Amino acid sequence: MKRFLLVTLLLSVVWSLSAQDKALAIRNNLLQEGNNSVLVVSHRADWRNAPENSLQAIRNCIEMGVDMVEIDLKKTKDGHLILMHDKTIDRTTTGKGKPEDYTLEELRKFRLKNGTNHRTAHTIPTFEEVMQLCKGKIMVNVDKGYDYFNEAYAILEKNGTTRQCIMKASLPYERVKAEHGDILQKMIFMPVVALDKEGAEDIIDGYMAHMKPMAYELVFSKDTPRYNG
């Protein structure tokens, strides 16, 4: 009996370490200069087989071996960070209105809807629940969440997940540095740059001069066969 318990414990430790190693490996691939690996990122997680931005959708991605999930944050009336893309809960839940008009407990009474607009048994998850699920298993890309940067970072730090999360903003380096300078060096930050807008190159130059991000998210309305700069 003791031998069985010891084997079970060892297997649990090995599984835990391998999960942590997986998240670290994904991060290293992302940051390694010249790495030709292709990373798979799931937009709002596995929204085809589960409600978007739900725990089940993220769990599916982990089981499929996806490298990174992209999520969006909103804040409840009582200050909890939750996963929600839209400004209202109308499209993705059985409720109506803005998430900031409800407490977390009130939002839990609604059910998430799937991609075909049908009610499911799933509820809106908190950001902390998501990071606890993702810890050591998958990278997390917080797309809409800059408004809650400090609160999100506090949750990441609390759960030991600062190294596997990407935060983003469509703002110049000077502003991001002024607002969150101490945090920028402790996590991965990805600038979002709208190439069609005036001053886009200046924004990129500002980041390159001071922090050299591992990547940029570039937004554009049209492309050309080659760069015409």
Region roles according to the model:
Residues 1-23:
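Bacterial Sec-dependent N-terminal signal peptides
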Residues 19-229:
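Phosphate-group recognition and catalysis centered on beta-loop-alpha active-site segments
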